[in-house]
């Protein structure tokens, strides 16, 4: 799966751009502020309906316009899909796939699975559990079609339950919601656990390449003691939850834990090793997607040279290319990428002041 055409209009500092990317490695280079990261951001926006740099859509729309427009042709083997998105300054989003209006942004994510590696990516290991749950849930969403609705039901019931807790109602008025919460929570947890187990198998081989002297253990925590019946726990913790005004245990508290020996990876590994670990997680997730669905992710890699030394830059690029996925990499100096490859990039683009120009024949300097 790959983008064969990308049209960007009034997106950040790009007034209008038309790209015809290769299905291999696409190198996008230019000075800071030129708009090269905006190209990656536009692809992400097209697949997720939001930016990886800002949740405020108004900031990505050029100030003199009231909307942004993104359009792409997507090759799926012998089939081709067309995806179009408009985001208005009012916040309204209009999405079409093959001419049909789409109401749910989750349909975009299913159609265009995207992996992002940026200088901020390793915050996955330092931020709270929410970002790691989102990482798990990206994979769970793609691996099991029942996950999206089950997790939506969990969130809906939790919202209702928390409101009842704040109103300090009797437990008998909450019991019905607890039964529903248990039912959907067990399904969500099962899908998450199975996904993490499968991801762990993919991750082992990649970590051997990236961190050969380190043994990283990955485990999934469900958000409550696995030896405890969740329904009984909700009843037992009812008074505590009333006092807090929210539900203290459940799948909304799940986490992905990574350790070296008895230490969290944050305490055991260097900053450079942590970056490599996050890259390994993203590659493993993409490989697992391919194994489970026969669909490749599209990889967006921003500012790679500043994050890794030459040896590990070469190793990461080779691992990415071995996935067979379409890759977009940005850099200030194209030589830093070209010199790390055994063969030149499939296609190169130069970006200057929001203007994107294709470089037909990439060569080593």
Swiss-Prot record:
Main location: cytoplasm
Keyword Chloroplast carried by entry: no
Keywords noted in UniProt: ATP-binding, Cytoplasm, DNA damage, DNA repair, DNA replication, DNA-binding, Nucleotide-binding, SOS response
GO biological process terms on file: DNA replication; DNA synthesis involved in DNA repair; double-strand break repair; SOS response
UniProt xrefs under Pfam families: SMC_N
Any GO CC annotation of this UniProt entry: cytoplasm
Compartments, as annotated in UniProt: Cytoplasm
Sample GO molecular function, one term: single-stranded DNA binding
InterPro entries xref list: DNA-binding_RecF, DNA-binding_RecF_CS, P-loop_NTPase, RecF/RecN/SMC_N, RecF_2
Residues where ATP binds: 30-37
PROSITE patterns from the UniProt entry: RECF_1, RECF_2
Its biological purpose: The RecF protein is involved in DNA metabolism; it is required for DNA replication and normal SOS inducibility. RecF binds preferentially to single-stranded, linear DNA. It also seems to bind ATP.
Similarity comment text for this entry: Belongs to the RecF family.
Protein's recorded name: DNA replication and repair protein RecF
Organism: Shewanella woodyi (strain ATCC 51908 / MS32)
């Amino acid at each position: 799966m790959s983008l064969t055409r990308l049209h960007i209009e009034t997106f950040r500092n790009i007034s209008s751009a038309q790209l015809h990317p290769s299905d291999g490695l696409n190198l996008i280079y230019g000075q800071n502020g030129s708009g090269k990261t905006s190209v990656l951001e536009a692809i992400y926006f097209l697949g997720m309906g939001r930016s990886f740099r800002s949740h405020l859509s108004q900031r990505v729309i050029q100030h003199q316009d009231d909307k942004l427009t993104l359009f792409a042709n997507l090759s799926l083997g012998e089939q081709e899909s067309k995806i179009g998105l408009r985001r208005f300054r009012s916040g309204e989003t209009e999405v079409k796939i093959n001419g049909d209006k789409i109401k749910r942004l989750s349909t975009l994510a299913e159609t265009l699975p995207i992996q992002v590696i940026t200088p901020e990516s390793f915050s996955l290991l330092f931020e709270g559990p929410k970002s790691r749950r989102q990482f798990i849930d990206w994979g769970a969403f793609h691996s099991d079609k029942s996950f999206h609705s089950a997790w939506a039901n969990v969130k809906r019931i939790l919202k209702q339950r928390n409101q009842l807790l704040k109103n300090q109602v009797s437990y008998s008025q909450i019991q019905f919601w607890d039964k529903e919460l248990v039912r959907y929570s067990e399904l969500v947890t099962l899908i998450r656990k199975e996904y993490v187990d499968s991801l762990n198998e993919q991750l082992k081989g990649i970590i051997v390449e990236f961190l050969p002297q380190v043994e990283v253990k990955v485990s999934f925590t469900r958000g409550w003691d696995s030896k405890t019946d969740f329904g009984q726990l909700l009843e037992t913790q009812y008074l505590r939850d009333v006092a807090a005004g929210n539900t203290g245990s459940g799948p909304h508290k799940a986490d992905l834990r990574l350790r070296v020996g008895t230490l969290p990876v944050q305490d055991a590994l260097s900053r450079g090793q942590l970056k490599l670990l996050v890259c390994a997680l993203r590659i493993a997730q993409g490989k697992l997607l391919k194994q489970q669905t026969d669909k490749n992710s599209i990889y967006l890699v921003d500012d790679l040279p500043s994050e890794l030394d030459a040896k590990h830059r070469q190793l990461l690029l080779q691992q990415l290319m071995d996935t067979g996925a379409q890759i977009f990499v940005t850099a200030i100096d194209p030589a830093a990428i070209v010199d790390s490859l055994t063969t030149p990039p499939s296609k190169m683009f130069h970006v200057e002041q929001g203007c994107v120009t294709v470089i037909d024949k990439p060569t080593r300097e």
